[in-house]
Swiss-Prot record:
UniProt-recorded name of the protein: Cell division topological specificity factor
Cleavable signal peptide: none
Family the entry assigns: Belongs to the MinE family.
Physiological role: Prevents the cell division inhibition by proteins MinC and MinD at internal division sites while permitting inhibition at polar sites. This ensures cell division at the proper site by restricting the formation of a division septum at the midpoint of the long axis of the cell.
Record Gene3D superfamilies: Cell division topological specificity factor MinE (3.30.1070.10)
Superkingdom assignment: Bacteria
Keywords: Cell cycle, Cell division
Lineage: Bacteria, Bacillati, Bacillota, Clostridia, Moorellales
SUPFAM superfamilies: Cell division protein MinE topological specificity domain
One GO-annotated biological process of the protein: cell division
Length: 98
């Protein structure tokens, strides 16, 4: 009965626990990878800039995060594509050849 009342009045401890656990996991992943939130935000902005040369994307729906699995950290980007641009800047040849 108490659990029902807590859920009814908006104090769902199970979901609060999940949110807190996810936040802690994200903090630990960022800490282990040595990536600050500022660096991740800069990376996100650079990704938007580069990808926008080729595709129209939904920047509001774009998500960039770090995940940690088995001692490996991965950058995960979820980028909603609206359409492919038909014209884009041409890639220049490098000034020197190896």
């Amino acid at each position: 009965m108490l659990e029902f009342l807590l859920r009814f009045f908006g104090r769902d401890t199970a979901s609060s626990k999940k949110v807190a656990k996810e936040r802690l996991r994200l903090v630990l992943v960022h800490d282990r990878a040595g990536v600050s939130p500022h660096l991740l935000e800069s990376l996100k902005n650079d990704l938007i800039k580069v990808i926008s040369e080729y595709l129209d994307i939904d920047t509001d729906g774009l998500e960039v995060s770090l995940t940690h699995e088995n001692d490996a950290v991965a950058l995960v980007a979820n980028i909603p594509i609206l359409r492919v641009k038909r014209t884009f800047k041409s890639v220049q040849e490098p000034a020197f050849k190896v």
